[in-house]
């Protein structure tokens, strides 16, 4: 169970790094917004966790047992980026829906015609689609995404 969770988080990290940073993709999939939130959470949640503990420690009555609540809140705040990575890892292995499959096939045919890829994928997943979008970004730059 533990190794499955770690592998899923690693898949989410790979999906996060592969997915192109194009704002227009937010119109088609929620992944762009979630990836931005995960990156911001990874940056700011440790600071928030430290602040929550210090605030409760220094500014509350020491006779109250509020420090335990602050620690639980901090642990939850620190876990938020990992929850996002876990969701992205699950999403990366999910097969593409029919609504995105046509876009995947047309993009794949364009890249094959320019001899950028040769492989054939039986059941494309979101990770495969992110790989194609990243390759399209590297090949054509922002021009491809401006056409969307």
From Swiss-Prot:
Keywords: Cell inner membrane, Cell membrane, Membrane, Transmembrane, Transmembrane helix
UniProt keyword annotation of Zinc-finger present: no
Disulfides per UniProt: none
Pfam family, one: DUF412
Matches recorded under InterPro entries: UPF0208 (IPR007334)
Keyword Hydrolase: no
Membrane topology, from the record: Multi-pass membrane protein
Primary localization class, coarse: membrane
GO CC term, one of those recorded: plasma membrane
Transmembrane spans: 41-60, 66-88
Cellular location(s): Cell inner membrane
NCBIfam families named among the record's database cross-references: PRK01816.1 (NF002493)
HAMAP family attached to this UniProt entry: UPF0208 (MF_01101)
Family per record: Belongs to the UPF0208 family.
Protein's name in the database: UPF0208 membrane protein HD_1715
